């Protein structure tokens, strides 16, 4: 991260008001699929964001990928495919958050309770309640990650089928 490297250097030199010399980088903003298509054919980066209509973005990108101009542009295809995978990951994460809402609340509560004990591993080992809490955290985390992996696999298979359809329509 170049910004952070320069910022650290300026801090080490004792420079005041670093933001006047080195403005913070602009945060990227979510955009609609057509703006992402423009960036894709221009070879510029774009990314998926939480809360977007991921299915709509994926559908729009798949349709756009069927256009010969896009298919003949490997960088655009790569950018669109990368973005679709980002949307799949976020869609799975958001689905897991809905499905595991109660478990996530429990997980947060357990982590808050265990945080002070995590500073002292000996205290953790000597406290059976802390060990049970740690096991429960692991259990919840494993269940969430397993479900997320299943969702990603299913969504990726759906994406692959749609991409195959596009390839066969263009090729045939």
Question: What do the PLM-derived regions correspond to, one by one?
Answer:
Residues 1-172:
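C-terminal anchoring/interaction modules
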């Amino acid at each position: 991260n170049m910004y952070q490297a320069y910022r650290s250097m300026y801090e080490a030199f004792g420079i005041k008001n670093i933001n006047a010399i080195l403005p913070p980088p602009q945060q990227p903003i979510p955009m609609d699929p057509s703006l992402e298509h423009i960036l894709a054919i221009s070879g510029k980066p774009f990314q998926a964001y939480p809360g977007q209509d991921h299915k709509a973005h994926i559908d729009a990108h798949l349709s756009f990928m069927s256009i010969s101009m896009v298919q003949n542009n490997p960088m655009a295809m790569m950018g669109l495919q990368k973005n679709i995978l980002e949307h799949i990951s976020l869609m799975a994460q958001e689905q897991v958050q809905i499905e595991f809402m109660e478990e996530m609340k429990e997980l947060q509560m357990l982590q808050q309770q265990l945080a002070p004990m995590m500073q002292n591993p000996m205290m953790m080992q000597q406290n059976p309640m802390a060990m049970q809490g740690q096991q429960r955290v692991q259990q919840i985390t494993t269940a969430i990650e397993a479900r997320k992996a299943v969702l990603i696999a299913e969504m990726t298979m759906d994406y692959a089928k749609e991409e195959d359809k596009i390839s066969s329509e263009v090729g045939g």
